[in-house]
UniProtKB/Swiss-Prot annotation:
This is Cytochrome b. It is found in: Mitochondrion inner membrane. Its main location: mitochondrion. It comes from Thrichomys pachyurus (Paraguayan punare). It is a multi-pass membrane protein. GO terms for cellular component: mitochondrial inner membrane; respiratory chain complex III. Heme b b566 binds at H97, H196. The gene is MT-CYB. GO terms for biological process: mitochondrial electron transport, ubiquinol to cytochrome c. Keywords: Electron transport, Heme, Iron, Membrane, Metal-binding, Mitochondrion, Mitochondrion inner membrane, Respiratory chain, Transmembrane, Transmembrane helix, Transport, Ubiquinone. CDD domains: cytochrome_b_C, Cytochrome_b_N. The cytochrome bc1 complex contains 11 subunits: 3 respiratory subunits (MT-CYB, CYC1 and UQCRFS1), 2 core proteins (UQCRC1 and UQCRC2) and 6 low-molecular weight proteins (UQCRH/QCR6, UQCRB/QCR7, UQCRQ/QCR8, UQCR10/QCR9, UQCR11/QCR10 and a cleavage product of UQCRFS1). This cytochrome bc1 complex then forms a dimer. SUPFAM superfamilies: a domain/subunit of cytochrome bc1 complex (Ubiquinol-cytochrome c reductase), Transmembrane di-heme cytochromes.
Length: 379
């Protein structure tokens, strides 16, 4: 195998990426999420492909085709719920992966980081369009509310919304195009992942210490392949437990009611992984302001390399910054909770406070704390 690994043009690329790749000797389990995201993407493409074989992207039959998949197709229920819960796992790993990047200062690899943010937007768009496809109440009203936000764009807004809808409301044309985009986007994501890895391999991996690891590297295989397989097995355990024991735990019961344009659900909300951004959107009374805050809540990630004021890369030896990061995590959990609550007191004011603190922690508190830590270390 070694004889073939080095000279073969295709296997050589795989060899340099996954076998003989020099990796830092001290990377922790927080570095497992990249490979887990790759597995999730593959799983989503495979299950999605089988679902697409039986799904019909038509308003009259979409809901019943999903029911047909669950009832009549061999293991259709398993494929459907593995796909739905696989998306939840995907986002859990994405948020862990981003959190790890922030904690250990991995954002200083700016090219890799920026491609990662583009990937996040692409995955979010894919998940949103996928949520529309079962054509339940929450699918329909979620699509209506979120696409309608674009009407806040000055001058071109209303025309843009109608152009996306393919008519004057969310209807057959909208569903068909959402299915087309939902099908093609994962392949675009796969291409972006390749670029993400390409940029990463230009610099090599970061490590928990934040120091240059070139003096102490080990081959990726067998050390990290075994470690990744352990992560994979744990992921499958969680995913299968979720899929087989409580497949609807993270879903919305309203989506088991067929879409009805004449009946608005009492509380329209997206899937749990978008609730933090949805809470930020709702906490601003102005429509355009809300949309800008929503977009900026994700785009703010691009500012991390610029806002890094510390003389150290990682937060490993910076307890004050660590406290702030965990405060940010707690804040995001509060935002997620608020996003799922009705728009009434006290949830409105809690959401507004959490939104203000989200932006102020990132834009003001983290950079100033880093400067203070530099002073404390007499740097």
């Amino acid at each position: 195998m070694t004889g073939m690994r080095x000279p073969h043009p295709l296997i050589k690329i795989i060899n340099h990426s996954f076998i003989d790749l020099p990796a830092p000797s001290n990377i922790s389990a927080w570095w497992n999420f990249g490979s887990l995201l790759g597995v999730c993407l593959a799983l989503q493409i495979i299950t999605g492909l089988f679902l697409a074989m039986h799904y019909t992207a038509d308003t009259t039959t979409a809901f019943s085709s999903v029911t047909h998949i669950c009832r009549d197709v061999n293991y259709g229920w398993l494929i459907r719920y593995a796909h739905a819960n696989g998306a939840s796992m995907f986002f859990i790993f994405l948020y862990f992966h981003i959190g790890r990047g922030i904690y250990y200062g991995s954002y200083s690899f700016t090219e890799t980081w920026n491609i990662g943010i583009i990937l996040l937007f692409a995955v979010m768009a894919t998940a949103f369009m996928g949520y529309v496809l079962p054509w339940g109440q929450m699918s329909f009203w979620g699509a209506t509310v979120i696409t309608n936000l674009l009407s806040a764009i000055p001058y071109i807004g209303p025309s843009l919304v109608e152009w996306i809808w393919g008519g004057f409301s969310v209807d057959k044309a909208t569903l068909t195009r959402f299915f087309a985009f939902h099908f093609i986007l994962p392949f675009i994501i796969t291409a972006l992942v390749t670029i993400h890895l390409l940029f990463l391999h230009e610099t090599g991996s970061n490590n928990p210490s934040g120091l240059n690891p070139n003096s102490d590297k080990i081959p990726f295989h067998p050390y990290y392949t075994i470690k990744d397989i352990l992560g994979l097995l744990l992921m499958l355990l969680v995913l299968l437990s979720l899929t087989l024991f409580s497949p609807d735990l993270l879903g919305d019961p309203d989506n088991y009611t067929p879409a009805n344009p004449l009946n608005t659900p009492p509380h329209i909300k997206p899937e749990w992984y978008f609730l933090f951004a949805y809470a930020i959107l709702r906490s601003i009374p102005n429509k355009l302001g809300g949309v800008l805050a929503l977009v900026f809540s994700i785009l703010i990630l691009t500012l991390f390399p610029t806002l890094h004021t510390s003389k150290q890369r990682s937060m490993t030896f910076r307890p004050l910054s660590q406290c702030l990061l965990w405060l940010l995590v707690a804040n995001l959990i509060i935002l997620t909770w608020i996003g799922g609550q009705p728009v009434e007191s006290p949830f409105i004011s809690i959401g507004q406070l959490a939104s203000i603190s989200y932006f102020s922690i990132i834009l003001i508190l983290m950079p100033t704390t880093s400067l203070m830590e530099n002073k404390l270390l007499k740097w």
